């Protein structure tokens, strides 16, 4: 039996900033049976173009297939894989943590400071903390505060850019 190694792949795509593009991209993944781990979309320095960052798990054949299929979509301008060591990848996470006592609040604030996060909301029974960083950093913070009681959590998914002078740009 052959053991095919699955890896996390981060794909960056420049697309036309118009209605229906994201639906066509997600439809492609659905039709092909590919699962999207996370997807983020945002406008670029050019208001007519958006950057879509997609995280998928799979072997290299799946990655190759995904990139080929994305390149066939009419509103997709350019697609590239962003390798972990050759890119900056970040995620934002908001976590509402149960902290009914001053001692619990103090503990959450201390953990947040160690992880260079921010307390963005404070109520009598909870705090909302903002943590930004790598997926591993966010997961480590979640594991640390889990025993205190996570009431609610929202993660943005990964967004990324290539390191150094390399840029993903439309063909001229």
Swiss-Prot record:
EC numbers: 2.2.1.6
Any one annotated GO CC term: cytosol
Reaction catalysis annotation: 2 pyruvate + H(+) = (2S)-2-acetolactate + CO2
One Pfam match: ALS_ss_C
Residues annotated as domain ACT: 10-84
Keywords attached to this entry: Amino-acid biosynthesis, Branched-chain amino acid biosynthesis, Transferase
Molecular functions (GO terms): acetolactate synthase activity; acetolactate synthase regulator activity
Pathway stated in the Swiss-Prot or TrEMBL entry: Amino-acid biosynthesis; L-isoleucine biosynthesis; L-isoleucine from 2-oxobutanoate: step 1/4; Amino-acid biosynthesis; L-valine biosynthesis; L-valine from pyruvate: step 1/4
Gene Ontology biological-process annotations: isoleucine biosynthetic process; L-valine biosynthetic process
InterPro entries the UniProt entry points to: Acetalactate_synth_ssu (IPR004789), Acetolactate_synth/TF_NikR_C (IPR027271), Acetolactate_synth_ssu_C (IPR019455), ACT-like_dom_sf (IPR045865), ACT_dom (IPR002912), AHAS_ACT (IPR039557), AHAS_small-like_ACT (IPR054480)
PANTHER family listed in its UniProt record: ACETOLACTATE SYNTHASE SMALL SUBUNIT, ACETOLACTATE SYNTHASE SMALL SUBUNIT 1, CHLOROPLASTIC
NCBIfam families cross-referenced by the UniProt entry: acolac_sm, PRK11895.1
Subunit structure: Dimer of large and small chains.
Entry similarity comment: Belongs to the acetolactate synthase small subunit family.
UniProt protein name: Probable acetolactate synthase small subunit
Species of origin: Methanocaldococcus jannaschii (strain ATCC 43067 / DSM 2661 / JAL-1 / JCM 10045 / NBRC 100440) (Methanococcus jannaschii)
